[in-house]
Amino acid sequence: MKKIRPLTEADVTAESAFFMQRRQVLKALGISAAALSLPSTAQADLFSWFKGNDRPKAPAGKPLEFSQPAAWRSDLALTPEDKVTGYNNFYEFGLDKADPAANAGSLKTEPWTLKISGEVAKPFTLDYDDLTHRFPLEERIYRMRCVEAWSMVVPWIGFPLYKLLAQAQPTSHAKYVAFETLYAPDDMPGQKDRFIGGGLKYPYVEGLRLDEAMHPLTLMTVGVYGKALPPQNGAPIRLIVPWKYGFKGIKSVVSIKLTRERPPTTWNLSAPNEYGFYANVNPHVDHPRWSQATERFIGSGGILDVQRQPTLLFNGYANEVASLYRGLNLRENF
């Protein structure tokens, strides 16, 4: 694996980055123009929302013990934590960015069971304590690129997925890894009400090729900003694959199953012409409704401070992962 370039201060996104709904992003900078046509009170509400005022308080996660490997270490000060935990994409708790923080308090994360099964020699189950104690945790500052054409950089805490899979010992028949979110309609209102949950089929499911899952960059994430994940960010454990669009980062995972066949994935089932299985960040393959050539890099500033920048192939991780797709037509296999 090639040496990874250390991130600089210009790379690090403030925690205010977790905002902007999918339907809002479609209009890109048009949101600010629309805001100017609103009544003054509505303008004030919108700009306060963007700045992070009046956000619901997120439950405090417990501090975690973790290392900071040199490849990911940074001494940079991060923006206040409530800005990352206040705005999220987690449709199980609603479509608006503030909904998960407002509604995810109903999610019960203790006890928790994560089952590893399928084409493995040694299936096993992890409980809640195992998630933060079975494997050494490390903090990694990763770029994150949403399919909605906005981006950020976040310090996640977790362990490489390959360490978990190695303990399960995949068989020679294992070709893919299927992931599944908790199904708990009484705790996750979006699973019970299609209006709240955006009409998706639940539970949320995702998948990777086995070689993608075994790549050192692929992270099972249990914390952010030094503490355990809050419910709205995917507690107690979620997936982060930094060279793929954010919807591949399945949250609140209860099942990891190795399979012979390619597993179904939620957004691909919902709109296969818009959301592919691979979902690799690619500036040369547009979404049917908007360009992916550039992105809005979201930092700590307000709505007028958002900067547009070129999108990098594989989200800037091409040196590490491009070899996985040698010979694959990335336009057809988006």
Curated annotation (Swiss-Prot):
UniProt keyword 4Fe-4S, yes or no: no
Tell me the organism's taxonomic lineage. Answer: Bacteria, Pseudomonadati, Pseudomonadota, Gammaproteobacteria, Enterobacterales
Q: This chain belongs to which protein, by name? A: Protein-methionine-sulfoxide reductase catalytic subunit MsrP
Q: Which residues form the signal peptide?
A: 1-44
Q: Which GO terms describe its cellular component?
A: periplasmic space
What are the alphabetically sorted keywords of the record?
Answer: Metal-binding, Molybdenum, Oxidoreductase, Periplasm, Signal
Q: Which free-text remark accompanies the cofactor?
A: Binds 1 Mo-molybdopterin (Mo-MPT) cofactor per subunit.
The record's account of how the chain is modified after translation: Predicted to be exported by the Tat system. The position of the signal peptide cleavage has not been experimentally proven.
Family matches, as InterPro entries: MsrP, OxRdtase_Mopterin-bd_dom, OxRdtase_Mopterin-bd_sf, TAT_signal
